[in-house]
C-alpha cells in the first residue's frame, strides 16, 4: 500500500469522501488521489517524495508557480503583525486599487474569501439593484456551490432550472434560467420570454469547468447588448480567467465590458480570497452604503491581501502576460502534434494561460453538448499514464489545465516527451 492509499483510507474515516472538495477524490479518473506534501515552482511532491510537473496549480491560483519568493516574503512580513483584525487595513486598499487599475470595468471592489462568495454576493447585489428575481446562467458553466447556481437545464431547449444537487429546493431553482453556452439565440429567447423579470446574466467568459471552451466571436458582445436592452446586470465570472487569460481578464482579451465582475484564485496568490466589483452605481447598493447586505469575518484578511498584492504586482511586470500565453501555446500545440502523429483523435483548445485536451473526432468544442461527446475513457487512460511518468494533469476530463510562469522550456519539453510515450502506449 502506498502512502497516498494509506492516507486516503485514514481521511475517509473523518472527512466525507476523504477530501474537502469532490474533484480531488479522483472519482472522475479512478484510482487513489495523490496526497501532496510540498510544492516549488512548477513542481509538486507527493507524500512518498515523488515529484510531478504540475498543470493544476491549485486549480488556477499558482500562476507564478508554487512557493514564489515574492509571495512568501510578503506573507512572512505580514504574519508578525497579526493574522486577522476584523477591521479595515491599509493593505486591502492597495489591493483594491491595483485590481481597479488592472480591470478598468471595476470602479469599486469588495473583498470576500472565496469565488463562491463572490458570485453569490454579485447575484444578490444584482437582484437587489434591479428588484428582479430571475437569473440566467449557462449549461456546463460553474460559478460555485451556492443554491442559485447549482442548477441544470430542464428537458426543453429553454426551461426553468432543475436542481443539480439534492438540498437545492425546486422552488428556489425555478428562478434560474439555463441557456446554451455559445448560443446567443437561446439567450435572446429567455429575455423575450421574461423581459421584465431577469435581474442578471452570469457567464464564464471562457468556460473552464467543462474543460476549456472559448466564446464564439461576437458571443460576449451579444450578451452585453441583450443585458443592456432588457435592463439586466451583465456579470462576467473571472474567478478562473481573471489575470490569467489576460492581465485585464477575459473581458479585456475579448473587448467586452460587464457591469459586475467576480474574481478569485489568482487574486489571493494561493490564499483564500475572492472579490466582486464593477460600476460604482451598482456597488454602492451594497451595505453599508446601500440596502443589499453582505459581510464576512475574514473578508480582507491582511495575510491574504498581502499575498494577493504580491502576486498581482509580480504578474503585472512587463512581458509576463505574453510569456504565459507563449508557454501555453507551446504546450497545447505540442500535445496536438503528438496526438496527430500517433493517430489519436484529439482537439486542443487554449487561451492565455489555460488549456484543454479533448479526446474526440470533433475539430472544435463549443458547448456542453460537444463536451459530452468526447471520449472520457481515453482521457482517463492518458491521465494515469502521464501521472505515472511524473506529469500531473487535472484529474477530470471536464477541467481546464493551467500553465504558470515557473514552467521552464525544459519542463514543457519533458511533458511533451512523456505525452509522446503515453500516446504511443494508447494506440
Curated annotation (Swiss-Prot):
Localisation per UniProt entry: Cytoplasm
SUPFAM superfamilies per record: PLP-dependent transferases
Known EC number: 5.4.3.8
Alphabetical list of InterPro entries matching this protein: 4pyrrol_synth_GluAld_NH2Trfase (IPR004639), Aminotrans_3 (IPR005814), Aminotrans_3_PPA_site (IPR049704), PyrdxlP-dep_Trfase (IPR015424), PyrdxlP-dep_Trfase_major (IPR015421), PyrdxlP-dep_Trfase_small (IPR015422)
Modified residues (N6-(pyridoxal phosphate)lysine): 265
Needed cofactors: pyridoxal 5'-phosphate
Reactions performed catalytically: (S)-4-amino-5-oxopentanoate = 5-aminolevulinate
PROSITE patterns found in the cross-reference section: AA_TRANSFER_CLASS_3
MF (Gene Ontology): glutamate-1-semialdehyde 2,1-aminomutase activity; pyridoxal phosphate binding; transaminase activity
A single cellular component GO annotation: cytoplasm
Keywords associated with the record: Cytoplasm, Isomerase, Porphyrin biosynthesis, Pyridoxal phosphate
CDD domains assigned to the protein according to its UniProt record, in alphabetical order: OAT_like
Pathway: Porphyrin-containing compound metabolism; protoporphyrin-IX biosynthesis; 5-aminolevulinate from L-glutamyl-tRNA(Glu): step 2/2
Biological-process GO terms, alphabetical: protoporphyrinogen IX biosynthetic process
Pfam families: Aminotran_3 (PF00202)
Subunit structure: Homodimer.
Stated family: Belongs to the class-III pyridoxal-phosphate-dependent aminotransferase family. HemL subfamily.
Protein name (database record): Glutamate-1-semialdehyde 2,1-aminomutase
Species this protein is from: Glaesserella parasuis serovar 5 (strain SH0165)
Amino acid at each position: 500500500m502506498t502512502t497516498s492509499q494509506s492516507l486516503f483510507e485514514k481521511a475517509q474515516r473523518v472527512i466525507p469522501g476523504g477530501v474537502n472538495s469532490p474533484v480531488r477524490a479522483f472519482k472522475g479518473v479512478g484510482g487513489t488521489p495523490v496526497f501532496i506534501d510540498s510544492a516549488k515552482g512548477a513542481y509538486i511532491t507527493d507524500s512518498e517524495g515523488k515529484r510531478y510537473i504540475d498543470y493544476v496549480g491549485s486549480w488556477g491560483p499558482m500562476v507564478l508557480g508554487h512557493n514564489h519568493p515574492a509571495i512568501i516574503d510578503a506573507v512572512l512580513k505580514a504574519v508578525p503583525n497579526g493574522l486577522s483584525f476584523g477591521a479595515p487595513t491599509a493593505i486591502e486598499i492597495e489591493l483594491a486599487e491595483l485590481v481597479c487599475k488592472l480591470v478598468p470595468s471595476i470602479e469599486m471592489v469588495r473583498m470576500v474569501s472565496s469565488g463562491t462568495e463572490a458570485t453569490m454576493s454579485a447575484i444578490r447585489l444584482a437582484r437587489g439593484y434591479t428588484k428582479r428575481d430571475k437569473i440566467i446562467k449557462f449549461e456546463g458553466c460553474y460559478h460555485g456551490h451556492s443554491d442559485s447556481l447549482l442548477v441544470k437545464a430542464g428537458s426543453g431547449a429553454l426551461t426553468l432550472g432543475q436542481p443539480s444537487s439534492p438540498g437545492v429546493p425546486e422552488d428556489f431553482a425555478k428562478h434560474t434560467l439555463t441557456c446554451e453556452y455559445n448560443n446567443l439565440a437561446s439567450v435572446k429567447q429567455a429575455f423575450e420570454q421574461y423581459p421584465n423579470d431577469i435581474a442578471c446574466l452570469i457567464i464564464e467568459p471562457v468556460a473552464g469547468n467543462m474543460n476549456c471552451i472559448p466564446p464564439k466571436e461576437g458571443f460576449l458582445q451579444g450578451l452585453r447588448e441583450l443585458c443592456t436592452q432588457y435592463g439586466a446586470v451583465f456579470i462576467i465570472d473571472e474567478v478562473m480567467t481573471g489575470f490569467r487569460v489576460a492581465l485585464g481578464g477575459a473581458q479585456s482579451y475579448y473587448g467586452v465590458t460587464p457591469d459586475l465582475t467576480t474574481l478569485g484564485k489568482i487574486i489571493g496568490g494561493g490564499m483564500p480570497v475572492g472579490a466582486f466589483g464593477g460600476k460604482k452605481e451598482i456597488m454602492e447598493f451594497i451595505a453599508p452604503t446601500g440596502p443589499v447586505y453582505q459581510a464576512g469575518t475574514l473578508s480582507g484578511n491582511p495575510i491574504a491581501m498581502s499575498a494577493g498584492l504580491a502576486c498581482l504586482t509580480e504578474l503585472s511586470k512587463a512581458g509576463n502576460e505574453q510569456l504565459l500565453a507563449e508557454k501555453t501555446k507551446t504546450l497545447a500545440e505540442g500535445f496536438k502534434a503528438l496526438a496527430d502523429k500517433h493517430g489519436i483523435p484529439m482537439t486542443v483548445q487554449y487561451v492565455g494561460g489555460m488549456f484543454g485536451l479533448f479526446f474526440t473526432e470533433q475539430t472544435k468544442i463549443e458547448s456542453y453538448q460537444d463536451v459530452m461527446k468526447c471520449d472520457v475513457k481515453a482521457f482517463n487512460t492518458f491521465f494515469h499514464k502521464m501521472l505515472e511518468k511524473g506529469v500531473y494533469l487535472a484529474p477530470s476530463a471536464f477541467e481546464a489545465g493551467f500553465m504558470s510562469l515557473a514552467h521552464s522550456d525544459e519542463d514543457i519539453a519533458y511533458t511533451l516527451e512523456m505525452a509522446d510515450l503515453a500516446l504511443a502506449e494508447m494506440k
